[in-house]
Amino acid sequence: MTETTSVHLPDGDMPAHLWLPPSGSGPGILLLQEIFGVSRYVRSRAQDLAELGYVVLAPELYWRLGETVDESRADVLEQGMALAGRLDWEQTVADSVAALTALRARPEVAGGVGAFGFCFGGGVAFNVAAVADVDVLVSYYGSALPTLLDLAGRVTAPSLHHFGTADSYIPLEQVERIRAAVSGPEVEFHLHEGAGHAFDNPAPMFHHSAATADAWALTTGFLARRFPVAAAGAAR
């Protein structure tokens, strides 16, 4: 089940989208958007996570700008880059932490909350995990990570990172810097050969089918081990 909701903030209500699992309850996942907003693709991944048994909340991080990306236009990449460039990073992290708190407080959530993000959202999720209590972190090619490595020591939750070896936005040299900074016993780090940035996005300009399949299998396995739905049911 999917519904539109909002996160109440001191200066307004941030729109958000909620997906419930078939059971109606489970552990929570805060799903943070790529630069294209809560796009069709992000919604499809939210549904995938809900079908695994998670309660998923995806906030509209562009809400303060009063604009969204029009996915029907040819300049979708330029739109996304422009909107992301206008966001205040610290405010966006604060909004995301508020969404995490709201998700944790929902009656459907049992068994903790995790942060999960793609691209822009991968960096936001990493920052959220550094300043708030999360049970797990999943970051797909977090685009801001090269600028956030001073926070690495503050991210203590079990973490999963995915990057492509052919990412033109985050060159392999930077990816290796990220790997060195975040490595530890609670961290899984995967490089996907030949995959570029946003390889999980089904748009032809980004998609890498083999990397998508491999990364999703690794992600679902990681979640099953480190953030299991069954444990949430037992804790309820």
State the predicted function of each range.
Residues M1-R236:
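N-terminal cap/leader regions of alpha/beta-hydrolase-fold enzymes
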